[in-house]
């Protein structure tokens, strides 16, 4: 979900020699005028909502600007709410890979974090205990950095078996209770219950319309956090 930068080069002007110049008088070479120096970018003063996730956040299969974090930003802007949504979704990421890049996320000093990881762990049949431990570590890191964490839960297709699915879903429930987090039990619930046209042909990822629905789901869940932050 880059534009090419354009640089301005100033062409040097040739200095003409004067007809009345003394013989053998050296002619000063033309020097190009210095290129203008761009102003340093100003830091965005808005508080950050970091969406720390996988391909669901990254907008897999969608055009630039169609991911659900993009949709969140549009809704917030339309409501004149001064928040900056930063999309930190990476397609294919597991919770282990999330742990490995946690420092880059906490360095943004987010006020709110939407933690949307674990789905790839489940789809790969990874041990539930390791997924739980990784999510636990990330939650602690974000909370220690001063962020309010919103946990976005996922589920799995029926062929993974009822026991594994139950234990997988329980990860999110248990961690939300342990750390007093806002929990979205199943991030894509509104998509699968409304119309399957909101899911791409792979049966996993949301369409552009589906991403807009997810954006609304997340914004509804974090509304109390947005209001609390505005009162500070």
Question: In which residue ranges do the predicted regions lie?
Answer:
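A generic secondary-structure micro-motif detector
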Residues: 6, 62, 91, 128, ...
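Conserved Rossmann-like nucleotide-binding pocket used by diverse enzymes
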Residues: 16, 84-86, 150
């Amino acid at each position: 979900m880059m534009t090419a930068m354009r640089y301005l080069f100033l062409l040097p002007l040739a200095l003409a020699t004067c007809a009345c110049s003394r013989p053998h008088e050296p002619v000063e070479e033309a020097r190009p005028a210095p290129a203008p120096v761009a102003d340093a970018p100003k830091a965005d003063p808005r508080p950050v909502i970091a969406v720390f996730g996988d391909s669901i956040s990254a907008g897999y299969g969608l055009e630039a600007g169609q991911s659900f974090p993009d949709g969140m930003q549009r809704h917030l802007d339309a409501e004149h709410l001064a928040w900056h949504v930063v999309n930190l979704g990476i397609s294919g990421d597991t919770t282990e890979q999330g742990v490995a890049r946690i420092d880059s996320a906490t360095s943004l000093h987010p006020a709110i974090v939407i933690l949307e990881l674990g789905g790839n762990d489940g789809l790969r049949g990874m041990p539930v205990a390791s997924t739980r431990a990784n999510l636990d570590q990330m939650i602690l890191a974000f909370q220690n950095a001063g962020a309010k964490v919103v946990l976005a839960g996922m589920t799995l297709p029926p062929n993974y078996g009822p026991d594994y699915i139950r234990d997988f879903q329980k990860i999110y429930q248990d961690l939300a209770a342990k750390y007093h987090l806002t929990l979205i039990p199943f991030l894509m619930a509104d998509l699968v219950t409304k119309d399957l046209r909101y899911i791409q042909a792979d049966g996993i990822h949301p369409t552009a319309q589906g991403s807009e629905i997810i954006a609304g789901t997340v914004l509804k869940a974090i509304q109390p956090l947005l209001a609390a932050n505005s009162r500070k």
